[in-house]
Amino acid sequence: MQSLSVPDIIVGRLPLYLRALSHMISEGQEITSSQDLGERLGISSAQIRKDLSQFGEFGKQGTGYNISFLIDQLRKILHVDRIWDVVLVGAGDLGRAVANYRGFLERGFRIIGVYDNDPKKVGQPIGDFVIEEPSRMMEKIRQDRIEIAMLAVPSAAAQEAAENLVEAGVRAILCYAPTSLKVPKDVRVQYIDPVLHLQRMTYYVP
């Protein structure tokens, strides 16, 4: 079903499809079409069909897609048909917002610990957690074989934190710091920098 040769831009659209389909289910809809899905997302129906065809045939011409079935298939493709344990590094304002966000678990991700190297923060409550020191994080990652981390530290601390995560066994990092990390080729990094998105939008604003 899954091909490692699928372009990143296509993989990046799959979560958008999954989210839109989940909204359809919550509205009581059972069947959809590439045109319906495309209108919700601002993506052409041809592009949606092309994207999905990279992974198999999920619908029939004239009858559309069974939404529940397509959701199940997309979850398998994205490997979110299970719960992933995640560590959060950084307990500043951004880290606190991330720790308190309730939408992770319902979409396949469970934060299992929050860590910070500031002695004044260690031991303090944050969301449902108590902030722990980084040495405990390394132990936890190795012990529970955790593969995903979220990095919400200042730019100056991001590279060292990433190196520690990789050393402990993390294979994927979601980085909120406005910097570029140097990691091994087999470690996946995704960046979230709101300023970059704002700068992209202002290009289109006269």
Residues covered by each model-derived region:
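HTH-adjacent hinge/linker in prokaryotic transcriptional regulators
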Residues: 31, 35, 40-83
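Extreme N-terminal segment that seeds HTH/winged-HTH DNA-binding domains in transcriptional regulators
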Residues: 1-30
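Hydrophobic/small residue at the entry helix of a nucleotide-binding pocket
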Residues: 94
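Glycine-rich Rossmann-fold phosphate-binding loop(s) that bind the pyrophosphate
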Residues: 91
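Phosphate-bearing ligand-interacting subdomains
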Residues: 22-25, 129-206
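NAD(P)-binding Rossmann-fold cofactor-contacting core
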Residues: 105-129
